[in-house]
Amino acid sequence: MLDIKLIRENPELVKNDLKKRGELEKIKWIDEILKLDAEWRAKLKEINKLRHERNKIAIEIGKRRKKGEPVEELLAKSKEIVKRIESLEKEVEELKKKIDYYLWRLPNITHPSVPIGESEEDNVPIRFWGKARVWEGHLERFLEQSQGKMEYEVLEWRPKLHVDLLEILGGADFARAAKVSGSRFYYLLNEIVILDLALIRFALDELIKKGFTPVIPPYMVRRFVEEGSTTFEDFEDVIYKVEGEDLYLIPTAEHPLAGMHANEILDGKDLPLLYVGISPCFRKEAGTAGKDTKGIFRVHQFHKVEQFVYSRPEESWEWHERIIRNAEELFQKLEIPYRVVNICTGDLGYVAAKKYDIEAWMPGQGRFREVVSASNCTDWQARRLNIRFRDRTDEKPRYVHTLNSTAIATSRAIVAILENHQEEDGTVKIPKVLWKYTGFKEIVPVEKKERCCSS
């Protein structure tokens, strides 16, 4: 939610930012907000003036009663003032509702470094890491997508897609999951289950070392938390509601972590608050018909380890760089080649002022795919959830800034590991950093093994 003071003092900045985002229909909202706000403030001023007048009359009534003088005329006048105040208060309340309707539906103000664009095609790669394995048939596309800034090894054999590897390795059952739950669900099996859990513990351990407090949040939250954390459109496209309850299944641990300190004034000395949340995530994926229908890349349910930061406003941009670097370090240790992308205005979403994605190179698919998103939401969520801080009790509270980043979404990390660490025969080598968590160094095709996890 935007600060009404920003709109009052710099409406052109807000209009220009909406233009950058391609939200042309909402530009006219700013003039409407200013008009409503002027009416609201004028009526508040009138209310305060009437209250002052009523107080003066009350004092005069007291004086007259002491003297035994008549007060009927003053009492009648006081009653008229009370009626007028009550009427104005209703008008003020209605005006506030109208203003809030607009404020709650305006996107965050973008950072100057966010590239202007219309879609994901306009996102800007800013750095690359790792040595990619590239099938010769994908080489031209890889060179274009990597801008010639990545090392690579050309493969004469064609790498398999993760969905085919899962079948070869006995790692998932999609047919039975579809029977039980429908599309975009899965049973994970055998070593892939161990790999999923290993990724969670690996990411958790790495972030605890960096000072993050581990949290298993509630998997369901009330509507006010979702309204405070995300946009209203997500209620239709992303979020599952529990029928008959004021509860929603979380699409990410970000949301319960954002709501954790709702309606609180934090002690400034405790900032930044660093949390690492571990949870399942539930998503409708309503707007993705036809995309990634096979496999585990885009599914209704998955596990995720999430970084969440409450920071001082003046420190949030530094923390944004830190949390994306934290995620990069995880993927470097998993030996996954990737690029970091600065998300453009048209693909940014409403909540973030700036967002980075990590896109892992997927040899089977022959393209980079998103595995991490890291956002600085500045005070957009904090205003909606009323999360403030102060350094002294006599100081006016200020809104915190909130930031979030994927550490690891296990399903997508598994896709990246399978496609990047596969051998020609379908064997998948486990990244060395995970050995102590998995207890095995590779996963071999079903036809080559007797049972799960045998040495």
Swiss-Prot record:
Its EC number is 6.1.1.11. Pathway: Aminoacyl-tRNA biosynthesis; selenocysteinyl-tRNA(Sec) biosynthesis; L-seryl-tRNA(Sec) from L-serine and tRNA(Sec): step 1/1. ATP binds at R283, K284, E285, V299, E370, V371, V372, S373. It is an enzyme of class 6 (ligase). It is found in: Cytoplasm. Gene3D superfamilies: Bira Bifunctional Protein, Domain 2, Serine-tRNA synthetase, tRNA binding domain. InterPro entries: aa-tRNA-synt_IIb, aa-tRNA-synth_II, aa-tRNA-synth_II/BPL/LPL, Ser-tRNA-ligase_type_1, Ser-tRNA-synth_1_N, SerRS_1_N_sf, SerRS_core, tRNA-bd_arm. GO terms for cellular component: cytoplasm. L-serine binds at T252, A253, E254, E306, T406. Belongs to the class-II aminoacyl-tRNA synthetase family. Type-1 seryl-tRNA synthetase subfamily. Consists of two distinct domains, a catalytic core and a N-terminal extension that is involved in tRNA binding. Catalyzes the attachment of serine to tRNA(Ser). Is also able to aminoacylate tRNA(Sec) with serine, to form the misacylated tRNA L-seryl-tRNA(Sec), which will be further converted into selenocysteinyl-tRNA(Sec). This is Serine--tRNA ligase. The gene is serS.
